[in-house]
Amino acid sequence: MTQSVPPGDIQTQPGTKIVFNAPYDDKHTYHIKVINSSARRIGYGIKTTNMKRLGVDPPCGVLDPKEAVLLAVSCDAFAFGQEDTNNDRITVEWTNTPDGAAKQFRREWFQGDGMVRRKNLPIEYNP
């Protein structure tokens, strides 16, 4: 599967980072919006740097042009100040879906030779 058109832009709200506020003795959930601002259908997948502390629901999906999805980013309880949080982030990866593909996410879209774009959203923890 070759793709000559690189994936277009997405927007995220918030645009640059995610902030969680103390206390961290309970689970926090923060919502972010991902908007496909391109003219083509995309498949997206979300990765986190810390699987045991951070979760995203839904972790992947398909967005038509101009369509948006609300994602729940959750942070499980942890001992703030006793764990390294410096590199925590979530990464949105997206790629154009093949022409004629059903609107159902497929992991192999990211494993071929098609172009995949990424947007990192660092996570900030306020004490």
From Swiss-Prot:
UniProt KW Flavoprotein keyword: no
The protein's UniProt keywords, in alphabetical order, are: Acetylation, Cell projection, Cytoplasm, Cytoskeleton
Q: InterPro entries per the record?
A: Ig-like_fold, MSP_dom, Nematode_MSP, PapD-like_sf
- Note the superkingdom of the native organism: Eukaryota
Domain (MSP) ranges: 9-126
The UniProt entry, under SUPFAM superfamilies, shows:
PapD-like
One Pfam family name is Motile_Sperm
Gene3D superfamilies reported for this sequence: Immunoglobulins
On tissue specificity, the annotation reads: Sperm.
Give residues where N-acetylthreonine occurs.
T2
Q: What is its main location?
A: other
Q: Which GO terms describe its cellular component?
A: cytoplasm; cytoskeleton; pseudopodium
List where in the cell it is found. Answer: Cell projection, Pseudopodium; Cytoplasm, Cytoskeleton
Query: What does the function comment of this entry state?
Result: Central component in molecular interactions underlying sperm crawling. Forms an extensive filament system that extends from sperm villipoda, along the leading edge of the pseudopod.
Quote additional remarks: Around 30 MSP isoforms may exist in C.elegans.
Protein name (record) = Major sperm protein 152
